[in-house]
């Protein structure tokens, strides 16, 4: 009962990529929580690779948060999957079936990984919110100094708060959980604070749904870039600076969002999908 896996790092976003294609057992809640609690395998998301169910996809991805809940999208995790598939010689360009739809990714010449995250959704009627919202560009939502959120769905829902001062001075660890569980969001929400530093860059911190305060969140970087452009604060192609590093986000004219950035490997090995026990590869 050996499932190959790699512990990876997407700008400080801790990711486990697990190849479940030949596994006869699904990941259990016990295994997920055990891996999350371990000092070496702790993660923000597990990206579980499965055989596709759609003919237009090469692989299917399940995404698990550290609290055992499932996610519809994970940008940095998707970049890690693309790197893993490339390094294991499965091809050069990949179409991945995710809960949010088909995403496409590839490794660039400079060794960075790019993923087409698809198109953002601003339609409140298609978002899991509990009340009618007329304009998702300006939503009444308050916690401390944070107010006037922009809601964007990148397959998962994000609330972005733009501030003029240094985002480090706002205790997101204090307000993040409160906003994540606000009654407006029956399925919870990712919460970010952003400060635009120029028409081509912004700084970002994110409280990730199901994971908490994180070093990086790829879908939040996409959502913040789109929200900033929508409010007329930035251009379409910008750098998003997160605590873990920088992602380039290109919001194309055709509405597709291209996210590009680095990934790193920690270690690889085999895990037991029932218990979460694991063994590292010997080098």
From Swiss-Prot:
EC supergroup of this enzyme: isomerase
Site entry (Could be important to modulate the pK values of the two catalytic cysteine residues), positions: 158, 208
Binding-site list for substrate: 13, 45, 65, 75-76, 156, 190, 208-209, 218-219
Residues making up the signal peptide according to the UniProt record: none
BP GO terms, sorted: lysine biosynthetic process via diaminopimelate
Main location: cytoplasm
Catalyzed reaction equations: (2S,6S)-2,6-diaminopimelate = meso-2,6-diaminopimelate
Presence of keyword Chaperone: no
Active site positions, chain numbering: 74 (proton donor), 217 (proton acceptor)
TM region positions: none
Subcellular location(s) per record: Cytoplasm
Keyword Lipoprotein: no
GO molecular function: diaminopimelate epimerase activity
Pathway recorded for this protein: Amino-acid biosynthesis; L-lysine biosynthesis via DAP pathway; DL-2,6-diaminopimelate from LL-2,6-diaminopimelate: step 1/1
Keywords linked to the UniProt accession: Amino-acid biosynthesis, Cytoplasm, Isomerase, Lysine biosynthesis
Summary of the function given for this chain in its UniProt record: Catalyzes the stereoinversion of LL-2,6-diaminopimelate (L,L-DAP) to meso-diaminopimelate (meso-DAP), a precursor of L-lysine and an essential component of the bacterial peptidoglycan.
Listed PANTHER family: DIAMINOPIMELATE EPIMERASE, DIAMINOPIMELATE EPIMERASE, CHLOROPLASTIC
The protein, known as: Diaminopimelate epimerase
Source organism per UniProt: Bartonella henselae (strain ATCC 49882 / DSM 28221 / CCUG 30454 / Houston 1)
């Amino acid at each position: 009962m050996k499932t190959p896996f790699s512990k990876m790092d997407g700008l400080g976003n801790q990711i486990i990529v697990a190849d479940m294609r030949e596994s006869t057992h699904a990941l259990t809640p016990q295994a997920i929580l055990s891996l999350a609690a371990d000092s070496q395998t702790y993660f923000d998301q597990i990206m579980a690779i499965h055989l596709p169910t759609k003919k237009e996809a090469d692989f299917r991805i399940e995404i698990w948060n550290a609290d055992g809940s499932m996610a519809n999208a994970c940008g940095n995790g998707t970049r890690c999957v693309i790197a893993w598939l490339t390094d294991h010689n499965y091809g050069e360009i990949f179409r991945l079936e995710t809960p949010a739809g088909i995403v496409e990714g590839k490794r660039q010449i400079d060794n960075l990984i790019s993923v087409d995250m698809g198109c953002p959704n601003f339609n409140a009627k298609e978002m899991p919110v509990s009340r009618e919202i007329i304009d998702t560009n300006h939503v009444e939502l308050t916690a401390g100094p944070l107010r006037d959120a922009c809601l964007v769905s990148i397959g998962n829902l994000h609330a972005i708060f733009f501030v003029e001062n240094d985002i480090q001075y706002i205790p997101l660890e204090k307000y993040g959980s409160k906003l994540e569980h606000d009654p407006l969001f029956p399925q919870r929400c990712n919460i970010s604070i952003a400060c635009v530093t120029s028409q081509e860059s912004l700084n970002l911190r994110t409280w990730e749904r199901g994971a908490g305060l994180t070093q990086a969140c790829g879908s939040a970087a996409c959502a913040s870039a789109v929200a900033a452009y929508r409010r007329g604060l930035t251009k379409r192609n910008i750098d998003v600076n997160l605590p873990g590093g920088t992602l380039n986000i290109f919001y194309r004219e055709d509405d597709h969002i291209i996210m590009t950035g680095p990934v790193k490997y920690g270690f690889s090995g085999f895990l037991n999908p029932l218990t979460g026990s694991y063994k590292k590869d010997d080098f």
